[in-house]
């Protein structure tokens, strides 16, 4: 069962709305600020309903012939990264900025990150600390077999598909790049948790692919939470070099070290930077 509801973001107070103040004696003019829609999809792959927060660009008309790129955002709940990433997309697509094409943003609301974003680990400590982890294969199947077909059928989409993932979401985006690169044209991988399973993903073969833009951003993050010491900045750099060394045709790889950012602050700046690199 798939349903759509209005996604409402209420302005903090009437006094903040466009800088205006209510006129004495008149009722408040405050009203909801519509940011997008909340959609719901029943997933057979995950055996559960999943919430999708959808941003549709200004001028979007389902009866029109214009089709839009789609940006798929992991950790896409309203209280996660959806609102500030949508702000970046909207701002950069304003006519007077014209940095990014008008795009649809699909925020995949999080249910259980460790379950959905990680593959099985052989590290005993990780298994004990995260007993439900290791089912990224099901989540990738959900994206491939259910989510993307649903979005393509319901919305006016082009063939351009971007994925954005940070931390464990960056690990998942990297796994998709390794195993199912055809699912996306552009990969925005931020502070990926490549330490998972003692960095085993970095040792796996990387499928050959063409026509990709890949951004890998990392801040000053230091040691990963592993028994065997791993540095997140080093792992991210190793990933970038591994992709570059394939010398695939028409593949652009951008490694971006942001020393003023940490694991908590990097997401917004990294996505902003990726847009500048993808759309010079």
What are these regions (language model features)?
Residues 155-166, 187:
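Alpha/beta-hydrolase fold nucleophile elbow
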């Amino acid at each position: 069962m798939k349903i759509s509801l209005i996604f409402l973001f209420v302005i903090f107070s009437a006094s903040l709305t466009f800088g205006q103040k209510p006129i004495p004696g008149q009722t408040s003019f405050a009203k909801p600020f519509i940011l997008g829609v909340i959609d719901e999809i029943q997933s057979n792959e995950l055996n559960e309903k999943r919430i999708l927060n959808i941003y549709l660009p200004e001028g979007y008309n389902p009866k029109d012939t214009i089709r839009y790129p789609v940006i798929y955002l992991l950790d896409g709940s309203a209280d996660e990264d959806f609102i500030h990433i949508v702000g970046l997309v909207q701002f950069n697509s304003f006519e007077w900025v014209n940095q990014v094409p008008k795009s649809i943003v699909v925020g995949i609301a999080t249910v259980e990150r460790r379950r959905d974003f990680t593959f099985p680990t052989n590290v005993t400590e990780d298994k004990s600390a995260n007993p439900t982890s290791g089912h990224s294969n099901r989540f990738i199947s959900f994206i491939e077999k259910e989510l993307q077909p649903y979005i393509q059928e319901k919305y006016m989409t082009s063939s351009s598909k971007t994925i954005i993932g940070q931390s464990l979401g960056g690990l998942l985006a990297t796994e998709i790049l390794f195993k199912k690169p055809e699912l996306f044209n552009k990969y925005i991988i931020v502070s990926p948790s490549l330490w998972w399973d003692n960095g085993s993903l970095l040792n796996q073969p990387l499928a050959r692919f063409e026509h990709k833009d890949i951004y890998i951003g990392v801040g000053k993050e230091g040691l990963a939470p592993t028994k065997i010491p791993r540095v997140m900045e080093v792992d991210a750099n190793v990933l970038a070099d591994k992709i570059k060394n394939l010398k695939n045709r028409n593949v652009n790889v951008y490694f971006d070290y942001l020393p003023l950012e940490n694991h908590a602050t990097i997401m917004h700046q990294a996505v902003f930077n990726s847009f500048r690199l993808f759309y010079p």
